[in-house]
Regions:
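Conserved GHKL (Bergerat-fold) ATPase module
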Residues: 1-493
Length: 493
């Protein structure tokens, strides 16, 4: 301030042109006068003005006064003599973490997100002054379902002035799932995302935040394993997303990321490998990780696997199909196979003994009998396969190849894979040639012509029942076929 200098008036009509002239003003300070046309009168409303100020200036380091505070008196609100300061000049992220309590962090979280009903799981207080300036607080939100995940919840400030809530290009993509505040004067403003990604300070800030997040997760895992397991279902998608998109984060997270089995027990990658490696290696010495995506729908194959002494993981998240593909690349001689993608006797191939004691003509006759009675489902193809299983195993099972099913699932989330989404679902009808009922079918269809086999199969109520039971156990018996199945059941009463 120079008391001898004349006041200056800056004026503009809203274009890039402006004028500067001397003005008649003796008191210190700046008056900003904006003129609103008749079409934008809502910007003169008190609530509208305060909402704009609160969004962009609610943590400005100097007080902002908007009128006077009001109180309820004599049945109405009246103004008091106290100024209505709408901003917090000393936000929590500017304070020393040592002097703060958990209540301070949760209270500030609800100040940032007043519509949130849940408490954050935990938080990270950032405070760096070299080689760049960075302060802030990042919160891990409590996720109840995949639909709760929202991006653009991190607010970027520069010296306590709000800049944006779109921080892509400033922090790694997976960190955009977090909530909170980042404040740094070293992040260039009003530049393209491509420029941000190449800026040296932004790279350092991004790397630092990633490391702090990983260190916090590792700290909780080491110091309180039970708490970490309790929170894992909410953390899982965040950690998997980070491992899929950030190589350095994968290397750190591989030590503490968890696998949950169908008995709700948690294991690290190393712990689970030790658990199954003595019993779940195939003939090629590949370690087979069996998993289910739904404990209810896949109860039967899960139960069969457990009776074999196998352990089954529960992988029911939207990123799991991508994540297990990454693990198969990273961990040598490892395969993930869903427990219903093959019969339990063949899901982990221990030897090459898979001979079928049927002639080609017997196979053709049996194939015709089953094919003629399998219902025609939209965008679904069935292929009959013969396998030698235990005679106490089910006579017919429906399976779906791991690769084709996985490609279909990935196509639903990933651009460039639409061709897999348009392909029909491919299922295998596994016929157990060792089962007494199938042996009887072989005898009764042998030597018959194709047409007569179809007629025989049409009249064989047991064959229809066996096929429908296989479809029912796979959740594929619907509509007319399900209704006919129920009718046949009542007819036996």
């Amino acid at each position: 301030h120079n008391s001898d200098s004349p006041a200056v008036k800056w004026s503009s009509d809203g274009t890039v042109e402006y004028k500067m002239t001397t003005a008649d003003k003796s008191d210190r300070g700046t008056d900003i006068i904006m003129y609103i046309d008749s079409e934008h009168k809502e910007f003169l409303e008190k609530d509208r003005i305060e909402s704009i100020l609160k969004k962009h200036c609610r943590f400005l380091p100097v007080p902002i006064v908007s009128g006077k505070k009001q109180e309820w008196k004599d049945g109405k609100y009246v103004e008091t003599e106290e100024d209505n300061v709408i901003n917090n000049t000393e936000p929590l992220w500017k304070k020393a973490p040592a002097g703060l309590k958990d209540e301070d962090y949760t209270s500030f979280y609800h100040q940032l997100y007043p519509m949130s009903m849940d408490e954050p799981m935990f938080w990270i207080h950032l405070n760096v002054d070299y080689p760049f300036n960075l302060t802030g607080i990042l919160y891990f939100p409590r996720v109840k379902s995949n639909l709760d995940l929202q991006r653009n919840k991190i607010q970027l400030y520069s010296n306590q002035v709000f800049v944006t809530d779109s921080v892509e290009g400033i922090v790694p993509e997976f960190l955009t799932l977090l909530h909170g505040v980042i404040d740094s004067p070293d992040i260039p403003l009003n530049v393209s995302r491509s420029y941000l990604q190449s800026d040296s300070n932004v790279k350092k800030i991004s790397s630092h935040i990633t490391k702090k997040v990983s260190d916090k997760l590792n700290e909780i895992f080491k110091n309180d394993r039970s708490q970490f397991e309790e929170k894992w279902d909410s953390l899982k998608m965040f950690v998997e997303y980070g491992m899929l998109t950030e190589e350095k984060f994968y290397d750190r997270a591989a030590k503490y990321c968890l696998l949950k089995n169908t008995d709700d027990k948690y294991f690290t990658l190393d712990e689970y490998k030790s658990l199954i490696e003595s019993n779940q290696k195939d003939k090629n010495d590949t370690l087979i990780y069996l998993y289910a995506s739904n404990k209810v729908d896949q109860f039967a194959p899960i139960d069969e696997a457990k009776q074999k002494g196998y352990d089954v993981l529960l992988l029911d998240g939207p990123l799991d199909v991508h994540w297990i593909g990454l693990l198969e690349q990273k961990i040598e001689k490892t395969r993930f196979i869903r427990v219903d993608s093959e019969t339990i006797d063949h899901i982990i191939e221990k030897d090459d003994n898979s001979s079928i004691d049927l002639s080609d003509s017997q196979k053709e006759a049996l194939n015709e009998a089953f094919t003629s009675q399998i219902p025609k489902l939209d965008k679904t193809n069935f292929t009959v396969e013969f396998k030698t299983l235990d005679e106490t195993a089910r006579p017919v099972q429906i399976t779906q190849n791991e690769f084709s099913r996985r490609m279909k699932e990935m196509s639903a989330m990933q651009q460039g894979m639409a061709m897999y989404g348009e392909m029909p679902d491919m299922y295998q009808v596994i016929v157990n040639v060792n089962h007494p009922f199938v042996k009887q079918l072989v005898t009764e269809t042998e030597g018959k012509e194709k047409d007569s086999i179809a007629t025989y199969a049409e009249e064989n109520s047991k064959l229809k029942q066996v096929i429908d039971l296989a479809l029912l156990s796979s959740g594929m018996l619907r509509g007319e076929e399900l209704n006919n199945f129920v009718k046949r059941g009542f007819e036996t009463i």
